[in-house]
Amino acid sequence: MAGGPVITEDDRCGHFALPIEGLLINGTQEWEGAVNQKQHKHLSAMCRCGKVKFEAVGPPILTGSCYCTSCQEAGRQLEQLASAPPVLDPDSGTSLILYRKDRVQCVMGQQYLEEHRLKPDSPTRRVIAQCCNSAMFLDFTKGHWLSMFRNRFPTGAPPLEMRVMTKERRVGVELADDLPNYSGHSGKFMLKLIAAWIAMGFRRPESTLGKTVHRV
């Protein structure tokens, strides 16, 4: 596979395969931040009932809201689970905070995590805390990042930087001009993902959180 990031039909919510063949960059070193993680800010994400807790270390890759049809469909279906808290924002967007996979860990309640996929063979999985059906994160399994649901951070969540895939937003939604609104994905979005991958030494750590595969 050559060239830039590839988007498949099921991956329109910004979860890309980033082929190393297309990045001819020499002298890449492992990210040094892991040595001094105590110097970085920790943010905690929790399920609604408090049984599941995640910690994210350091600054996120980016924070944005996605309006793709896949995120909207998954959000609607996850919200239909018993007593589930909201996933979608009122304007049909899904607010996400993207972190490197090696900077997010579940520190409490891992046994409650359960993954859901729109299709059995989808590379994108959404992991909920089944204790209260709170959506915790989205994992594009071929990527190097996790997309944490922003509404699961009770405090300290960084503000949104952009809106993406706005061409697929719900009919009738008028977006404010307080943020950059991109009909697809922006160059800034892509560059930040690639920069994070370079800093990771082109590694793609696997997230094993959530065991059972379900179709939502």
Provide a role label for each language-model segment.
Residues 24:
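Small, basic N-terminal interaction modules of short regulatory proteins
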Residues 27, 31-46, 52-216:
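A short Gly-Trp-Pro
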Residues 7-9:
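Intrinsic low-complexity, disordered N-terminal segments enriched in polar/charged/small residues
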